[in-house]
Amino acid sequence: MNRPERLQPGVKLRDADKVSRIPVKVVPSERDTMLRKPDWLRVKLPASNQRITDIKQALRKNGLHSVCEEASCPNLSECFNHGTATFMILGAICTRRCPFCDVAHGRPLKPDAEEPKKLAQTIKDMKLKYVVITSVDRDDLRDGGAQHFADCIREIRLLNPEIKIETLVPDFRGRIDAALEILATEPPDVFNHNLETAPMHYRKARPGANYQWSLDLLKKFKERHPNIPTKSGLMMGLGETNEEIAQVLHDLRAHNVEMLTLGQYLQPSKFHLPVERYVSPAEFDELKELAESIGFTHAACGPLVRSSYHADLQAQGKEVK
């Protein structure tokens, strides 16, 4: 039996190389078996790409990453033109191999100690009023990257005192309490952690993660910071039923989560998990009604909704779909 090749620091593994060692194997999709995208998933491209170019140049100038690009988000054009971006800290290489995600897997490099200052200056240069800070999973770090999050929040606020900051954090596997202790020194304005899918699909879609751990992370943060909104997001189209998603919504409310995003899963490549169904806008509307009826203060539900899609409007309680 051949031993797996040792990962080299800083080398990005994608597609087949990324998903080759996960528990539930992904069979590459054949074009004739892939579901055809419905018309409601067509993305309208902007008339001008100048704003997109400006933001990309600002990111490259300071060696920063956006999850918009790294995860191939379908809303990149709209969000960049709107003047918003979700910054991805701690590098662009994840220690997990989730087969729904287009972010590269591998052995990450040491965190850039100057990244918090570079991020703060970039945000100031871009004149942003609301930012989302997320990261890859960093299971290689003792605190899962929590101190780097806190450092980024502190530096951003020093240069941008009026800004609102939302964090979209990983699950801090095995170190939740230590991570929350660190984040308590610089808490965000909105705390977001995505459950992604229903628990019966975790082994297939989120190898290395645990549904209850993720719920506990959200609940424990809320217990420490009762006045800070907590938020979570789910994808549809991975094989779940609407009834399973409804149960997840009830679980989130039982753990005091107040804000919700619900969107359609889109397959990044033939090597990723296939789309098993396209959920209609009417079904998203029904789930939004359910979410609001059980106490979510804000629910953004629609085919192209993502956890950071118009996050500023979500935080203001405005409708996003």
Swiss-Prot record:
Its EC number is 2.8.1.8. InterPro entries: Aldolase_TIM, Elp3/MiaA/NifB-like_rSAM, LIAS_N, Lipoyl_synth, rSAM. Pfam families: LIAS_N, Radical_SAM. Disulfide bonds: none annotated. The keyword Membrane does not apply. It catalyses: [[Fe-S] cluster scaffold protein carrying a second [4Fe-4S](2+) cluster] + N(6)-octanoyl-L-lysyl-[protein] + 2 oxidized [2Fe-2S]-[ferredoxin] + 2 S-adenosyl-L-methionine + 4 H(+) = [[Fe-S] cluster scaffold protein] + N(6)-[(R)-dihydrolipoyl]-L-lysyl-[protein] + 4 Fe(3+) + 2 hydrogen sulfide + 2 5'-deoxyadenosine + 2 L-methionine + 2 reduced [2Fe-2S]-[ferredoxin]. One of its GO terms (cellular component) is cytoplasm. One of its GO terms (molecular function) is lipoate synthase activity. Keywords: 4Fe-4S, Cytoplasm, Iron, Iron-sulfur, Metal-binding, S-adenosyl-L-methionine, Transferase. It is found in: Cytoplasm. CDD domains: Radical_SAM (cd01335). [4Fe-4S] cluster 2 binds at C94, C98, C101. Belongs to the radical SAM superfamily. Lipoyl synthase family. This is Lipoyl synthase. The gene is lipA.
